[in-house]
């Protein structure tokens, strides 16, 4: 009996090892992460949890842009746990465009986000997604929405963001710039989404119930990704752990949004009787002939907030960090800003600071757009994304992807591969986005630069994002010089969005434009008349300054 049991165990182990050898041999990328029996590549995943995106990039470099791995190497479960990881632009075009219908968000993604986002555009596939996409696309192409974004952004910059930075400058206190940017973009996106300002960016940096509840709901939702589906569903059913926080937070979000929608219905009714007009996204949907349920309208607004809030603020955080350590790039950005303001606002620099740049001025900032794009190439706001495989398929590089498996396309890695961006791919060089004469912004292939997604799901708010980021960046750099506070370490936070782990603590000092105006004068942009020095201090023009082509300098 004992002998037969032993032989049976040996036979089972031998059969498993033969199966394991077969499946690992069939996988693309033998130089990828080490595969272990039963646990697959999970040990490597855990070991590199604090440098996940770099670990994925290292594996992709070793495997020429694509590899396959399995989180759980158990027969009958392996296919579902098989993940194809790629950053090859040819593969990305195939997944995101050519065979778009074969690679939806998939059931896992939708189950995780359903409680928060329902069947909103961010979380849906098929006809549901297509209907919302077409409806939203009509709104995003209107000049009215862009003008509304310009108003919300500039109002927040002038009345809140700049005063907070100026106060920090006067007091000599460092600020967590990432936190300020998150508050700023949250207020802006709420204003644009449903016309209500939560005012999270105020001098006292208050806690807002809706913002806090939305953040907690998002965090709890993302936590579902790191555990098997049956585990978080069981915790939800039993009311355990973060599922309790998620449920409570969703109630707060729902109450807030219900109040917003009911109030807006009354306001739109009053508008028909001569009341004020609203141009936010929610109002524009409510004015349509189609009758949308309140739940649908709520999901429209929440999807828009989730898609537009963290992405812009995170990109700006990495931008200011990169620019603060690259004085050459900072100088070129300032030369561009000052040159344009001299043309549009005249010769007195004090007038440059009275109002933030309007979007006609922002549109001309080509080098600034290049610097922001270069930031997103190296530090994309969403570093990794995934798709579900409907039917067996072959990627352009020959990789077989079976039905039921998943594909992760690494946006972070795409920007860091020599075979895609050249030997200098790890350098911060905005010039790679400019034409040879340096005057025009050059649009890159969307499958090499996937920060805004690509194909039918390409980001509808791309132009609005650039408008917001350029407006904020120009306002800050024109007034202040930023430097990372001594002792503060900038690290990536491992989440779906590429936050800085401990924020971005920076010292704020006055911007001295003297070298910038001298640079402009040297290259013949403006003419010098006489002179001393100029220092912008708290937005106040200092007396005793020189004039450069009439520009106080």
From Swiss-Prot:
What's the protein here called? Cytochrome P450 86A22
* Signal sequence bounds: none
What the protein does comes down to: Fatty acyl-CoA omega-hydroxylase essential for the production of omega-hydroxy fatty acids and the biosynthesis of triacylglycerol-/diacylglycerol-based estolide polyesters in the stigma. Substrate preference is 16:0-CoA > 18:1-CoA > 18:0-CoA.
Q: Does the keyword rRNA-binding apply?
A: no
Q: Which GO terms describe its molecular function?
A: heme binding; iron ion binding; oxidoreductase activity, acting on paired donors, with incorporation or reduction of molecular oxygen, NAD(P)H as one donor, and incorporation of one atom of oxygen
Record's Gene Ontology CC terms?
A: membrane
> Which of this chain's residues are annotated to bind heme?
459
Which topology term describes how it sits in the membrane? Single-pass membrane protein
Kindly list the places in or outside the cell where this protein is found, as annotated in its UniProt entry. Answer: Membrane
Q: What is the lineage of its organism?
A: Eukaryota, Viridiplantae, Streptophyta, Embryophyta, Tracheophyta
Q: What is the organism of origin for this protein?
A: Petunia hybrida (Petunia)
What are the EC numbers?
Answer: 1.14.14.129
Catalysed reactions listed for this entry: (9Z)-octadecenoyl-CoA + reduced [NADPH--hemoprotein reductase] + O2 = (9Z)-18-hydroxyoctadecenoyl-CoA + oxidized [NADPH--hemoprotein reductase] + H2O + H(+); (9Z,12Z)-octadecadienoyl-CoA + reduced [NADPH--hemoprotein reductase] + O2 = (9Z,12Z)-18-hydroxyoctadecadienoyl-CoA + oxidized [NADPH--hemoprotein reductase] + H2O + H(+)
Q: What is its main location?
A: membrane
Family affiliation: Belongs to the cytochrome P450 family.
Give the InterPro entries listed for this entry: Cyt_P450, Cyt_P450_CS, Cyt_P450_E_grp-I, Cyt_P450_sf
The regions listed as transmembrane in this protein's record are 8-24
Obligatory cofactor(s): heme
Q: Which CDD domains match?
A: CYP86A
**What PROSITE patterns does the record tag this protein with?**
CYTOCHROME_P450 (PS00086)
Q: Name one GO biological process term.
A: long-chain fatty-acyl-CoA metabolic process
Where does tissue-level expression of this protein occur?
A: Mostly expressed in the developing stigma of floral buds. Weakly detected in leaves, stems and flowers.
Q: Which UniProt keywords apply?
A: Heme, Iron, Membrane, Metal-binding, Monooxygenase, Oxidoreductase, Transmembrane, Transmembrane helix
Pfam families documented for this protein: p450
């Amino acid at each position: 009996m004992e002998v037969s049991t032993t032989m049976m165990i040996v036979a089972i182990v031998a059969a498993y090892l033969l199966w394991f050898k077969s499946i690992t041999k069939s996988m693309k990328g033998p130089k990828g992460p080490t595969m272990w029996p039963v646990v697959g590549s999970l040990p490597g995943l855990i070991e590199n949890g604090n440098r996940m995106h770099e670990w994925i990039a290292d594996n992709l470099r070793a495997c020429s842009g694509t590899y396959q791995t399995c989180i759980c190497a158990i027969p009958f479960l392996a296919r579902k746990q098989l993940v194809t990881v790629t950053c090859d632009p040819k593969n990305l075009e195939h997944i995101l465009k050519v065979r778009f219908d074969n690679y939806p968000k998939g059931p896992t993604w939708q189950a995780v986000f359903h409680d928060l986002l329902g069947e909103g555009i961010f979380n849906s596939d098929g006809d549901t997604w297509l209907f919302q996409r077409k409806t939203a696309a009509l709104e995003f192409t209107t000049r009215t929405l862009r003008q509304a974004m310009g108003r919300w952004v500039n109002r927040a910059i002038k009345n809140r963001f700049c005063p907070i930075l100026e106060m920090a400058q006067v007091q000599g206190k460092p600020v967590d710039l990432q936190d300020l940017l998150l508050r700023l973009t949250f207020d802006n996106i709420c204003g644009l989404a449903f016309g209500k300002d939560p005012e999270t960016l105020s001098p006292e940096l208050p806690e807002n119930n809706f913002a806090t509840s939305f953040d907690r709901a998002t965090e709890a939702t993302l936590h579902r990704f790191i555990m098997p589906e049956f585990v978080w569903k069981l915790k939800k059913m039993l009311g355990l752990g973060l599922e309790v926080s998620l449920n409570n937070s969703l109630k707060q979000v729902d109450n807030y949004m219900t109040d917003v929608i009911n109030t807006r219905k009354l306001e739109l009714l009053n508008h028909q009787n001569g009341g004020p007009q609203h141009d936010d996204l929610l109002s524009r949907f409510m004015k349509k002939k189609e009758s949308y349920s309140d739940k649908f309208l709520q999901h429209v607004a929440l999807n828009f907030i989730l898609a537009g809030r963290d992405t812009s603020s995170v990109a700006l955080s990495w931008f200011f960090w990169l620019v603060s350590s690259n004085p050459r790039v900072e100088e070129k950005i300032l030369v561009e800003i000052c040159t344009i303001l001299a043309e549009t606002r005249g010769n007195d620099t004090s007038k440059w600071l009275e109002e933030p740049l309007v979007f006609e001025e922002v549109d001309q900032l080509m080098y600034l757009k290049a610097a922001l794009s270069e930031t997103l190439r190296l530090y994309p706001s969403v570093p990794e994304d995934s798709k579900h495989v409907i039917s067996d398929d072959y990627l352009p590089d020959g990789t077989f992807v079976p039905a039921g498996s998943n594909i992760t396309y690494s946006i972070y890695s795409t920007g860091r591969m020599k075979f895609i961006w050249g030997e200098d791919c790890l350098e911060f060089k905005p010039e790679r986005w400019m034409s040879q004469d340096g005057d025009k912004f050059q649009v890159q292939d969307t499958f090499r630069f996937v920060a805004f997604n690509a194909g039918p799901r390409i980001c509808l708010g791309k132009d609005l994002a650039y408008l917001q980021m350029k407006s904020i960046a120009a306002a800050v750099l024109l007034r202040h010089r930023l430097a990372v506070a001594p002792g503060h370490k900038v690290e990536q936070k491992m989440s779906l969005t590429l936050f800085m782990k401990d924020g971005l603590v920076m010292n704020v000092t006055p911007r001295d434009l003297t070298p910038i105006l001298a640079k402009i004068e040297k290259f013949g942009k403006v003419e010098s008349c006489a002179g001393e020095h100029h220092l912008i201090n708290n937005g106040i023009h200092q007396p005793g300054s020189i004039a450069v082509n009439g520009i106080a300098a």
